[in-house]
């Protein structure tokens, strides 16, 4: 797992992070939490193509899946963040997403006796600040682990694919499906997605050239 030396996993830190993740006060109008887009019933992702923020503005991407982030090396769809502690700060201040400022978030949390206690348990006295909030959120996200899917069981040798599943797996790994070139094989180190992402590649969805060219 990718766990920074200055943010070791603790029960208290993860507990605080869980409270923050589900708290709508992290948004500008107190209406949207992280879990508002990263839906638990959708594996902490969302079943829509684009996310909508507190001001009703639809973004250009959707909320990424949050499971198994402890093994991920890059964050956001374009990989611009290299730690979870860095990543969790941005959605709060993004004007298209939660449209808030961290100083305002901290002020709200300081007025809640529950958070005073949770921060103290996790990080000591007078610990309510942006850095510790980010550390707590990162700790919680690293606890979201899935490792018992059919594919996990297949890799462990405890499950045999059905004929249809085997066909899909074979197609993934051959030139017909052509999935493996970007997402890698089962042995690829986890970087992004259920399989590894070998590199960030233009998928052609936003091509700007004229179809007549």
Where does each model-flagged region fall?
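Short alpha-helix boundary/capping motifs
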Residues: 45, 94, 112, 147-148
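Periplasmic c-type cytochrome electron-transfer domains
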Residues: 54-142, 213
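Intrinsically disordered or highly flexible coil/loop and linker segments, enriched in small
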Residues: 97, 146, 150, 177-178
């Amino acid at each position: 797992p990718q766990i920074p030396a200055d943010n070791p996993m603790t029960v208290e830190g993860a507990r605080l992070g869980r409270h923050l993740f589900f708290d709508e006060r992290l948004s500008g109008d107190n209406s949207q939490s992280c879990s508002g887009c990263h839906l638990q019933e959708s594996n902490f992702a969302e079943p829509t193509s684009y996310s909508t923020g507190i001001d009703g503005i639809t973004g250009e991407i959707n909320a990424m899946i949050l499971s198994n982030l402890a093994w991920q090396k890059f964050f956001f769809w374009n990989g611009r963040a290299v730690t979870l502690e860095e990543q969790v700060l941005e959605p709060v201040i993004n004007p298209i997403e939660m449209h808030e400022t961290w100083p305002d978030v901290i002020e709200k949390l300081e007025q809640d006796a529950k958070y005073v206690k949770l921060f103290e348990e996790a990080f000591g006295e007078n610990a309510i600040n942006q850095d510790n909030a980010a550390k707590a959120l990162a700790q919680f996200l690293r606890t979201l682990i899935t490792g018992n899917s059919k594919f996990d069981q297949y890799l462990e040798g405890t499950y045999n694919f059905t004929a249809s599943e085997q066909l899909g797996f074979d197609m993934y790994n051959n030139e017909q499906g052509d999935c493996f070139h970007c997402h890698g094989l089962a042995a690829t180190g986890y970087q992004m997605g259920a399989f590894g992402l070998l590199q960030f590649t233009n998928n052609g969805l936003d091509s700007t050239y004229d179809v007549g060219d």
